[in-house]
């Protein structure tokens, strides 16, 4: 089981340390006609197939055919689920009380795209979910076909398999979001963080603001995951997580530094053609340096290669997507501290921020970060 967990954790890193809220299916429920019936159909049918495959965790635990390793993980997931509700004040509802084996490595594949000299992601807008910087597909082949189409228009693209997505609690009446084989074998600390992250999306959702939504959920998963490990996990689980998280933090720091370097280069993207050629050259050097520094990290990690798939397709789309998940996290963590570590007060404060115009809420979080 440990080898399986390591393998699954490595696969998840194709969307590195970013357990995304894909919302592919829930967004499709409000699609306008111009989006296309094909995308609508794959979104709805893919989600329904997943829901139909899910069975209550209690059924899996009572089934003599269920492998003991899976029973152990499912039992752990239910302890985490109860902890999230009782200790973190996250919603206590139908989500993550059922399990489905999808017989594939990802639940959806997200397509992201950005211009040659910008980290600003292309967005897709839906009447229900608002505008998001990715487009989700239940079929990897369809995702790659969409990426190829976008690439043909001159955009840089990325296709990332993701292990989970949230329906924001809107479908709890139909059974909620299920546990999936795509993440159930994660190391304990990572499993706790994923469940906490996805439940956080059911607390607050600001339309048209992926960065706010994902940074909030990431802050909750970090704070809540730390509490789980400190109070519930075994010393072995804490040690395993410390090694895993240490690598993640080093990788994220490298990605963040490179992203800021690219941003500085692209600040001149209004320049005439000769200057643009210089920008392209500087960009190439920055990404080459990123890959060289990553190889140095791998050596220090003893050869751990979990981030290889992400690095292999590192481009503006990949760096732009990462920004949504960590840019505002320090501000949210500072806000949690200002609210005395009280989860209910923290969530209420975040809801007030979500009611503000986008620029105002971002500025408020950035100010809190500098004042902490």
What are these regions (language model features)?
Residues 253-372:
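Pan-zinc metallopeptidase signature
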Residues 56-87:
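Post-signal-peptide N-terminal segment of Sec-exported extracytoplasmic proteins
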Residues 51-68, 124-132, 312-314, 330:
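Acidic/histidine-rich, surface-exposed loop or edge segments in extracytoplasmic proteins
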Residues 4-22:
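Bacterial N-terminal signal peptides that target proteins for export
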Residues 38-43, 47-58, 182-189, 214, ...:
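Metalloprotease/metallohydrolase-associated module, dominated by Zn2+-dependent proteases
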Residues 32-33:
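C-terminal motif of bacterial Sec signal peptides marking the signal peptidase cleavage site
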